[in-house]
Swiss-Prot record:
Disulfide bonds: none annotated. It comes from Sorghum bicolor. This is CASP-like protein 1U1. Its main location: membrane. It is found in: Cell membrane.
Length: 178
């Protein structure tokens, strides 16, 4: 019975990780804002701020999409191929996919948080204004996407730990003996 509980918990967190990584990539890919600034007189200037202007945020979208693919593949293999006979270069594939998804998600979240701090002026910037002063909604979306991405990474880690404790016939209830 305990093995079924661990497997159900792992499935739950795998589904959550897939949804959260997709949501983070979508929120970041739609992060843009038109900023209208006053020119002092009757003139006004405007410019657009978008995730595509920052390499780290473009990496975020790509990493989120790649981790979603890794999470979907791991979910399929975990749920459908319960015997875990799928191995690549003598390593079980599900833990490799879990590790890849975690790596992409944690690095993407870090890149987004760092970019948000740099774009937002940070504490060490010493400037009077930043992009986030004028485009607060853009920076808000970047922050939300980074937080969702971090939660997705934690979900993948929890799913991996739960699947490891699910048992499955190997010694001491451990499924993946590296």
């Amino acid at each position: 019975m305990a093995e079924e509980v661990w497997k159900a918990l792992s499935l739950l967190f795998r589904i959550a990780a897939l949804g959260l990584s997709l949501a983070a990539a979508i929120v970041m890919a739609t992060a843009s804002q038109l900023v209208i600034g006053g020119g002092g007189g009757h003139e006004s200037s405007s410019y657009s701020v978008s995730f595509g202007q920052y390499n780290a945020l473009r990496y975020f979208v790509a990493a989120g999409a790649i981790s979603a693919v890794c999470s979907a593949a791991a979910l399929y293999l975990f749920a459908v191929r319960a015997d875990f006979t799928v191995v690549v270069v003598s390593l079980p594939l599900v833990p490799v996919l879990d590790a890849a998804a975690q790596g992409f998600l944690f690095s993407a979240a870090g890149a987004a948080f760092a970019t948000r701090d740099v774009v937002g002026g940070g504490t060490s910037a010493g400037r009077g204004s930043s992009v986030c002063d004028a485009a607060g909604a853009f920076c808000g979306r970047v922050t939300v996407a980074a937080a969702v991405c971090a939660f997705a990474a934690v979900s993948v880690a929890t799913a991996a730990l739960a699947s490891r404790d699910a048992g499955g016939g190997s010694s001491e209830g451990r499924r993946f003996e590296w």
